[in-house]
Amino acid sequence: MSNITIYHNPACGTSRNTLEMIRNSGTEPTIILYLENPPSRDELVKLIADMGISVRALLRKNVEPYEQLGLAEDKFTDDQLIDFMLQHPILINRPIVVTPLGTRLCRPSEVVLDILQDAQKGAFTKEDGEKVVDEAGKRLK
């Protein structure tokens, strides 16, 4: 079993790029397709705490439930926002990566490089053509 876990959405380019950077370090992570297998309340609360971000910072804003539920309004408690994320996992921003070096919301995808123990094994270019890692495995930005 891998010591890296990614909460992944294969339809998301940022999530796909993050997964490939993990693989470029020589590790095959545990992949949780969080839309199909959402985290439990306790797991979600722990992820948020470990990332050191607010509950609201994990909310995706550009999805239908956000508008339908009126989540832009500042009237909801953190517990209520977590309830909404559990009921509508599409509201959980992604990808979230957990490694021995920390837990991060990897937006942009190269944030994952900050928490990988192993160096990149070679060049990495994002799907959009942006070069992130050179041939020697060194981060470019």
Curated annotation (Swiss-Prot):
Pfam families on file: ArsC
Site feature Important for activity. Involved in arsenate binding and transition-state stabilization, where: 60, 94, 107
Annotated site residues (Important for activity. Lowers pKa of the active site Cys) in this chain: 8
Field pH dependence: Optimum pH is 6.3-6.8.
Effect in UniProt of substituting residue 94 to K: Loss of reductase activity. Mutant exhibits slight resistance to arsenate
Outcome recorded upon mutating residue 88 to R/S/V/W: No change in reductase activity. Mutant retains arsenate resistance
EC number: 1.20.4.1
BP-aspect Gene Ontology terms: response to arsenic-containing substance
Family statement: Belongs to the ArsC family.
Subunit and interaction comment: Monomer in solution.
Full protein name: Arsenate reductase
Organism expressing this protein natively: Escherichia coli
Origin organism lineage: Bacteria, Pseudomonadati, Pseudomonadota, Gammaproteobacteria, Enterobacterales
